[in-house]
Amino acid sequence: MQTTMLKAKLHRARVTHSELEYEGSCAIDGSLLDCAGIREYEQIQIYNVNNGERFTTYAIRAADGSGTISVNGAAARLAAVGDIVIICAYVGLNQAELAAYRPNLVYVDENNQITRTSHAIPVQAA
């Protein structure tokens, strides 16, 4: 049996481009992909903090250090330049793999530059 777990998260990234006529996907600064462990063409989920939209696409690599988060194709109707998004990738793990499992969490500033990384989300206080 496999359990689907959060593999990686880019937390509160800012959309820098929205290209309706592009082939599709989401272009992400390559240094962010590397830090999070998200592979080019990997399926990702995008959660738009501004409007509540949640959608699936795949990652493509943008220039390292560029800060680019470009939502392309039909998904461009779901995210505008300046919107804050959470980008997640998931992985299926078997019971043996779960014991050592830790997600890659990447936190960015308003220019999509890495401010910190973590492998755990703090317990939410009531």
Swiss-Prot record:
Which family is this protein grouped under? Belongs to the PanD family.
**Which cofactors does it use?**
pyruvate
Spell out which residues are annotated as carrying Pyruvic acid (Ser).
S25
Q: How is the quaternary structure described?
A: Heterooctamer of four alpha and four beta subunits.
HAMAP family with a match to the protein in the record? PanD
What's the record's note on cofactor binding?
Binds 1 pyruvoyl group covalently per subunit.
- Keyword Cytoplasm in annotation: yes
Gene, per the UniProt record: panD
Q: What class of enzyme is it?
A: lyase
EC number from the UniProt entry: 4.1.1.11
InterPro entries, A to Z: Asp_de-COase-like_dom_sf, Asp_decarbox
Q: Which reaction does it catalyse?
A: L-aspartate + H(+) = beta-alanine + CO2
Which ranges does the record mark as transmembrane? none
> What processes does the entry annotate via GO biological process terms?
alanine biosynthetic process; pantothenate biosynthetic process
Fetch the Gene3D superfamilies from UniProt.
Answer: 2.40.40.20
PTM statement from Swiss-Prot or TrEMBL: Is synthesized initially as an inactive proenzyme, which is activated by self-cleavage at a specific serine bond to produce a beta-subunit with a hydroxyl group at its C-terminus and an alpha-subunit with a pyruvoyl group at its N-terminus.
Q: Which CDD domains match?
A: Asp_decarbox (cd06919)
Name of the protein in question: Aspartate 1-decarboxylase
Localisation per UniProt entry: Cytoplasm
What is its biological role?
Catalyzes the pyruvoyl-dependent decarboxylation of aspartate to produce beta-alanine.
Single GO molecular-function term? aspartate 1-decarboxylase activity
Source superkingdom: Bacteria
- Pathway(s) served: Cofactor biosynthesis; (R)-pantothenate biosynthesis; beta-alanine from L-aspartate: step 1/1
Give the keywords, sorted: Autocatalytic cleavage, Cytoplasm, Decarboxylase, Lyase, Pantothenate biosynthesis, Pyruvate, Schiff base, Zymogen
The Gene Ontology CC terms held by the record are: cytosol
- Which segments does the entry list as coiled coil? none
Positions binding substrate in this chain are T57, G73, A74, A75
